[in-house]
């Protein structure tokens, strides 16, 4: 009987001593990297990020974005007089894509519970933006004066050329035509957003990030570099071009993200 009392007295201590084993301790990973798709209101591309954990709440990172950039009034058209004509953007001077490279901070708002869920962080970053502008080349229709047959010449689009009208443009030329005439303009960007990470495994990154980006290609009132900074991005003719852009973005990371 005394043995039974003794066991009953020790039973509560035995229960409490086992309780910590029920709690799952999450690993704080020091490093992260991800590569994914970038969609924004004026184009699309890809993005990447390398992150270091400072503590439980704060992280810092280096990032890059590579994406196309369209003019808001850019509209694709086609010469309806020819069934095999190619689509093109009438009035487009340059095909433009941008490369962003910058530094940012990330702050934890809501962590995942032990049973899963969504990890939510606020992000902010800034850096340099490089805009690459490749001139547009088109296939132009001409008619032989003697045979009256049509033939095609590949020419750089010129809005002042009387032959470069919707009636005489057959379509776009190869994208690679004009690569050797590409121009570079330099600016900067600011980005703010929210990141929603939902992977079931802690060492995997699967996330959706959404926010806004401001790109500016004018620094001060005077151009201190005459070869790019301060100029408008000449994307379209026949309409006003801008040197600053405000876009909404979504980054999708699914396959190429990990923590260690």
What is each PLM-predicted segment?
Residues 22-30, 76-87, 166-175, 228-230:
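Flexible, solvent-exposed coil segments and beta strand-coil junctions
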